């Protein structure tokens, strides 16, 4: 279908050594421990604003809509009560991934979110977990394609179509009752479960390339090959100073940002392409990749963790970015290292799962925040929105907004 001939860009160990966790221009401001919670009934984490295929965050008939990974808070479940009857929120929070469901919320203000409920009825999704993706408003009739990840057993990129309906009172969803599997890891470009039981393959983010008008998708993957078989050569190392050439067990880290191209704009058939960016020997996770198109350039963002860095490297939980003049690269790591917005060292787990929107606003969720008594408070709710400014290959934190502030960039009046 496509003659895209390109070589993946390598995020090198030398690049990652430049990560500076103490640079205030790339550090997310402190989240206070007295943060508000969206719901006492559910946890939320990965947030997916409704958008168009060019990345524009949209509202419908004046209603903003977000989709979230969601799990019930089991505060009355005996499984999560200790001997004194106290709720063990930490265990409940840590176990959320196994029961993740995609739900939706709506708002007139771009905050003050109202819970709408499940997107898909129980049993519609063919696997036990509904993991993150991207909801796309297709037209003024209110049709939505929700691209997401079907997980356990396996991991498959999929989509499900439904419709958004509005009234003066709120928003409802209809349809979303037939899931279409699109593709799984191929073992040629992207690692499969048989090659690595800890493989990553998820987080579809479709988009129209502003240059050629075709429909593409980026997603998280790992570079194909048996676990531990990857070689960290000169290209993966980059130009390293003395004392930094021992890679330890870095061969186990093989994250990449994958890409696929659709046969047509329906998005029903896809061809898997080589990765855009690889992180062999650097990091094992490049989650929730997504593009911002600005000034004729391609800003490719992803999120990653401190704990998924390879031996000899470190960096904060947060957003990492790469810049190119072309869709297929080559890409250069933003700010020299790739780090765009990281948690502060004093609160390394305060936020995660950032989504950079074309207006520079960055949404994320609160994970856990230290408290004055030396403990910590679990979040499971929206974090304060941060604005960053992109200037060529550099980025700067500029402002903090309210919790969960995700304003629309465009309002669509439905037919």
Curated annotation (Swiss-Prot):
It catalyses: [6)-beta-D-fructofuranosyl-(2->](n) alpha-D-glucopyranoside + sucrose = [6)-beta-D-fructofuranosyl-(2->](n+1) alpha-D-glucopyranoside + D-glucose. The record marks 203 as: Transition state stabilizer. Optimum pH is 4.0-6.0. One of its GO terms (biological process) is carbohydrate utilization. It comes from the Bacteria. Its EC number is 2.4.1.10. GO terms for molecular function: levansucrase activity. Optimum temperature is 20 degrees Celsius. The active site is at residues 46, 287. Sucrose binds at residues 45-46, 132, 202-203. Keywords: Carbohydrate metabolism, Glycosyltransferase, Plasmid, Transferase. InterPro entries: Glyco_hydro_68 (IPR003469), Glyco_hydro_beta-prop_sf (IPR023296). Belongs to the glycosyl hydrolase 68 family. Catalyzes the synthesis of levan, a fructose polymer, by transferring the fructosyl moiety from sucrose to a growing acceptor molecule. This is Levansucrase. It comes from Rahnella aquatilis (strain ATCC 33071 / DSM 4594 / JCM 1683 / NBRC 105701 / NCIMB 13365 / CIP 78.65).
């Amino acid at each position: 279908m496509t003659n895209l001939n390109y070589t993946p860009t390598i995020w090198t160990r030398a690049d990652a050594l430049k990560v500076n966790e103490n640079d205030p221009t790339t550090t997310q401001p402190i989240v206070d421990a007295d943060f508000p919670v969206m719901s006492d009934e559910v946890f939320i984490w990965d947030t997916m604003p409704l958008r168009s295929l060019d990345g524009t965050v949209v509202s419908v008939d004046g209603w903003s809509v977000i989709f979230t990974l969601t799990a019930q808070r089991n505060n009355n479940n005996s499984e999560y009560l200790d001997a004194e009857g106290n709720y063990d929120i930490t265990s409940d929070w840590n176990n959320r991934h196994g029961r993740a469901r995609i739900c939706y919320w709506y708002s007139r203000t771009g905050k003050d979110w109202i819970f709408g409920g499940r997107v898909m009825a129980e049993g519609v999704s063919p696997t036990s977990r509904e993991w993150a993706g991207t909801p796309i408003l297709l037209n003024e009739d209110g049709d939505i394609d929700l691209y997401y990840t079907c997980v356990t057993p396996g991991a498959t990129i999929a989509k499900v179509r439904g419709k958004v309906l509005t009234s003066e009172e709120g928003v409802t969803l209809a349809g979303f009752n037939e899931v279409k599997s699109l593709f799984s890891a191929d073992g040629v470009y992207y690692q499969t479960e048989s090659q690595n039981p800890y493989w990553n393959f998820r987080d579809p983010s479709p988009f129209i390339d502003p240059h050629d008008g075709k429909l593409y998708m980026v997603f998280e993957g790992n570079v194909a090959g048996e676990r531990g078989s990857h070689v960290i050569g000169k290209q993966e190392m980059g130009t390293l100073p003395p004392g930094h050439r021992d890679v330890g067990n870095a061969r186990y880290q093989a994250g990449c940002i994958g890409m696929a191209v659709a046969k047509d704009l329906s998005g029903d058939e896809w061809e898997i392409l080589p990765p855009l960016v690889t992180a062999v020997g650097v990091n094992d996770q490049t989650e929730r990749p997504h593009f911002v198109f600005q000034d004729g350039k391609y800003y490719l963002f992803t999120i990653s963790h401190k704990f998924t860095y390879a031996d000899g490297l470190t960096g904060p939980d947060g957003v990492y970015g790469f810049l190119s003049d072309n869709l297929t690269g080559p890409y250069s790591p933003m700010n020299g290292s790739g780090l765009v917005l990281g948690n502060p060292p004093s609160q390394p787990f305060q936020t995660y799962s950032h989504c950079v929107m074309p207006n520079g606003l960055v949404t994320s969720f609160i994970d856990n925040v230290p408290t004055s008594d030396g403990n910590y408070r679990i979040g499971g709710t929206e974090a304060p929105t941060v604005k960053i400014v992109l200037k060529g290959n550099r980025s700067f934190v500029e402002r903090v907004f309210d919790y969960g502030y995700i304003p629309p960039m465009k309002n669509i009046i439905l037919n």
